[in-house]
């Protein structure tokens, strides 16, 4: 399962402005900024805001040293303004305590303002190539269908069981490709309605519910 998800990502990955080379000096900044912006917001909405934001604040240091008013001004229209306040606070902490870099443990990441379990998992996996569990809406939908779990997505009990299932699926290598492949699968193939099961690399693992949703 993990291999076919990674293979599909290698051959069909989306081109997104925050997906830069792993050796890029902007990698970690782009990753944490995009994760904040993508919380409860679709990719197509985030892209122009991300590009404008990074042209004004190209790194953690520049973001940390600007005023909150400037941050909120660029964030205007994206909504959920607590995210803007939290990324500004986080940038200040990263500049002061982490030399404008990011901590690389789940515990330290979750100490930063606005970063929960899933966002920390995304940073670990995509920013550091370490094991990290991502449970955004797209990934949760894929995992629900793969596991045959029919419970409502956002129930505490459901999230707990999905977290355990996600741990089982974590590969031993290539964490970044697997995580990005899982997110891309949920965004482009395993959609909420009319999923394209005939194009899914793990369609044989889907429950009959996913097929029913195509009709």
Regions found by a protein language model. Name each.
Residues 65, 211-212:
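Intrinsic disorder/low-complexity segments
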